[in-house]
Amino acid sequence: MIEKLYGKNINFLIGSGASFGVIPTLSSNYINDKNEKLSIEEILVEKGNDDDLQNIIYLWYYHEILKVGYLKELKEDNLVFKNYQKLLENLIKLLQRENYQKEKRINIFTTNYDLFFEKAADSLVGKYEFYFNDDSSGNITKKLSMKNYHKKIYHTGIFDNFDREIPIINLFKLHGSVSWKYVNYKNDKPYEIKIEYYEDKDTKYIENLIEEISNEEIDIAKEIIENNESLKENIKNTKKELFKDFVLIFPEKNKFENTLYQEFYYQNLRQLSYELEKQNSILIVFGFSFADEHIAEIVKRACNNPTLNIYIFCYSLNTENEILNNLKLEEFPNNIKTILPEDNGNIDFNIFLKKLFEINLKIESDNNE
């Protein structure tokens, strides 16, 4: 479908399914009293008064999602990493082929905390001429500011005898990043966010107590805590410390420990809304189920734009119904197209790339064609 992208305002919405294989998703094997399987977010909401359970899950969350998200031990031949590389490479090539009348810019919105996009972009420096914009500015200390997204960069040559626009990939991390840290406190409140690409060596979190989120594992861990006062004390403030240390939206509905990030979150959402309201916009969705109610509402509202086209790549045949439910729709509007797997298979990252950059992929006619 690559031919559908030229000349358009291109936006991506990438969720946890893209990093699966290295970073776990928020699904779990936990069953509640009604015999319902819950996601991690649903467990934390339903068991909001169980402090031990909350701390056990947040400790697991730190070790399995946040700590792994730095990708310190990632090898360059890792398949997930190579898929991120291929995505960025193909997008850079697409922008290089755009005509001079079209801005050479693509926006990637992601709810993932990990550093896959950053590391993939870094690996392409020197191979391609492009600018990867993660919203930061600075040299020794890199700080975030929304105004950093509104840039155009040109190559002029030694004698300034021509202007050639450099392709820009904008990365919007809607739920924060493991690399973001609060700085410059005033009256015990931070007012800036900086980027640190490495985990603090003096981490204070104890070893993980469970291997997976399941009733059996959590019950065993809770019993261990009950019989060990020292361990109980060590784990007591896990959730509180994580909220303080990481600039993230954690897997609980409507949870903002810090108003600075709440403001930053809504600024990012407004940017998503603004991009989808532009003429001839495209939104390509992969690995995302629309469980975030704010994002779901923005995308639904954006469907009123008659020139917007949304392509949702569904991991499995069941994913289509899950997304319909999360969007609170009975059927998709005309400008949402779902791309389903063939032969009861799955659309993983590799197949997504093949379908996305395949010429003449059969999809229903676009709204504005």
Pin down the residues of each PLM region:
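A Trp-anchored, charged/polar loop motif used as the substrate-binding/catalytic surface
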Residues: 1, 86-94, 148-158, 260-271
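Alpha-helix boundary/N-cap detector
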Residues: 48, 52, 75-82, 108, ...
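Compositionally biased, low-complexity linear motifs
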Residues: 29-38, 125-133, 192-195, 279-282, ...
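Extended, H/D-rich, highly charged conserved domains that either
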Residues: 21, 100-250
